[in-house]
């Protein structure tokens, strides 16, 4: 019986620590309350994340000139349609002050089809979240609170990342 309890304890700790192996992820000890998180769609309509309470949200800040953004965008696109994450909403928010034609060309060049581009104009969210660079992804739980941040690029296809993210879904 002791061996069974020890085995379960060890297995639980191994899986609980898997997320620590994912580079560039910062998990907040306490979730941060967010207010007035508003950005624009490609028709300049305002999108407020409070309209998506009850969903797991990823705000991905990026720019067309950013090489790491180019690397991660296809896997982020696939994450949006991952069948294990049915309540996930991904919002790629361009902060490069780039025109919409250039952003649309970027999406076409990288075959991004599962979400639309969004825009932070005039860079209000970049300031609000104190972004230090791109790409940066803000992870928001079902209560509308920031619980983690990805600073830099990651492979959104990573099985450990998806498994960890499912615990918030």
Which role fits each region the language model picked out?
Residues 17-49:
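N-terminal "domain-start" segment that seeds a small globular fold
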Residues 48-70:
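Short active-site neighborhood of thiol/selenol oxidoreductases, capturing the structured segment around
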Residues 34-35, 57, 134-135:
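Short loop/turn microsegments at loop-to-beta-strand junctions
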Residues 71-110, 121-127:
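Structural microenvironment flanking redox-active thiols in thiol-disulfide oxidoreductases
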Residues 3-12:
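Sec-dependent N-terminal signal peptides
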Residues 54-56, 86-89, 114:
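Loop/turn elements at helix/coil->beta-strand transitions in domains of secreted/extracellular proteins
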Residues 58-59, 90, 137:
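Hydrophobic beta-strand anchors of alpha/beta hydrolase catalytic cores
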Residues 108-113, 120-164:
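Thiol/disulfide oxidoreductase modules built on the thioredoxin-like
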């Amino acid at each position: 019986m002791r061996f069974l309890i020890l085995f379960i304890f060890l297995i639980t700790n191994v899986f609980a620590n898997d997320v620590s192996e994912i580079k560039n992820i910062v998990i907040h000890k306490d979730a941060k309350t967010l207010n007035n998180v508003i950005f624009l769609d490609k028709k300049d309509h305002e999108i407020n994340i409070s309209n998506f309470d009850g969903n797991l949200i990823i705000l991905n800040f990026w720019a067309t000139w950013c090489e790491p953004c180019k690397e991660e965008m296809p896997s982020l696109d696939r994450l949006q349609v991952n069948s294990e994450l049915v309540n996930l909403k991904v919002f790629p928010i361009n902060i490069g002050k780039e025109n919409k034609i250039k952003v649309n060309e970027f999406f076409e060049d990288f075959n991004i089809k599962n979400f639309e581009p969004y825009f932070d104009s005039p860079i209000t969210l970049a300031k609000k979240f104190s972004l230090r660079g791109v790409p940066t992804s803000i992870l928001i739980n079902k209560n509308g609170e920031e619980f983690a941040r990805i600073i830099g690029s990651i492979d959104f296809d990573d099985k450990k990342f998806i498994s960890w993210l499912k615990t918030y879904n």
